[in-house]
Amino acid sequence: MDIIFYHPTFDTQWWIKALRKAIPQARVRAWKSGDNDSADYALVWHPPVEMLAGRDLKAVFALGAGVDSILSKLQAHPEMLNPYVPLFRLEDTGMGEQMQEYAVSQVLHWFRRFDDYRIQQNSSHWQPLPEYYREDFTIGILGAGVLGSKVAQSLQTWRFPLRCWSRTRKSWPGVQSFAGREELSAFLSQCRVLINLLPNTPETVGIINQQLLEKLPDGAYLLNLARGVHVVEDDLLAALDSGKVKGAMLDVFNREPLPPESPLWQHPRVTITPHVAAITRPAEAVEYISRTIAQLEKGERVCGQVDRARGY
């Protein structure tokens, strides 16, 4: 069994050593331009077209939860990967736990009004504020995949009303499910906190725009943990300035790194982190990949395969 590996920023030697230990029967090598030798599996992130083109692969693993970059490259270069080759993504591998930590900490930050107290502190103002009531602090999750499910589970501990919206209806205990465009307005109408965990597809680009934000309750909060292209930044800034949206916590942006001149940096109601909400944990990723390859070799059914038509 031959495995080729390519990632522009990861510690390649660490990965090769870990993969060889996890899959002793495999010959693992770092792919370099000009390497056209045979391979059974490819582990990639932002791969060059020539790495995958023309190869008779058993499967390709994207080294992250999102596959929008490789799918967009496939649209421009369909010869890059044969359509029958399955493409897998890292559905969790520790990212679910990180998303839970991020979402819970920020929801509680808003619920306890720490954002308001920070603004008061900036003006040396001492004033206790009325508390929010949990039953009025409904949290809505846009995107009901593996990570959305994990975030919902973590928030249930705090007894907030929960709802989710996705392409198809879900049956999550304690979570009200909405599905399809026809139910989006009803979903948004009660969301004091909107958490975005949608996949990046042509249908979801720009979905968080003026029209969507207007359907939220006044003074709602936005937590974007998915992709920057989901948010029309000018529309969000207008909603923040008007008070329609009271605060936003943003981990992802249309341009990354976020340019220094972006007005988001200086907005008093915006908090920024540099795309760190959920980072691939190498040891857990290697365990998932080695387990999945073993299942594929046995002809077993596996999880995490990407539907290229849907985009996730």
Curated annotation (Swiss-Prot):
Originating organism: Shigella dysenteriae serotype 1 (strain Sd197)
Reaction equation(s) it catalyzes: glycolate + NADP(+) = glyoxylate + NADPH + H(+); (R)-glycerate + NAD(+) = 3-hydroxypyruvate + NADH + H(+); (R)-glycerate + NADP(+) = 3-hydroxypyruvate + NADPH + H(+)
Molecular function GO terms recorded: glyoxylate reductase (NADPH) activity; hydroxypyruvate reductase (NADH) activity; hydroxypyruvate reductase (NADPH) activity; NAD binding
Keywords: Cytoplasm, NAD, NADP, Oxidoreductase
Catalytic residues identified in the record: 227, 275
Enzyme Commission number(s): 1.1.1.79, 1.1.1.81
Main location: cytoplasm
Localization per record: Cytoplasm
CDD domains per record: GDH_like_2
Protein name: Glyoxylate/hydroxypyruvate reductase A
NCBIfam families for the chain: PRK15469.1
Family statement: Belongs to the D-isomer specific 2-hydroxyacid dehydrogenase family. GhrA subfamily.
Protein function: Catalyzes the NADPH-dependent reduction of glyoxylate and hydroxypyruvate into glycolate and glycerate, respectively.
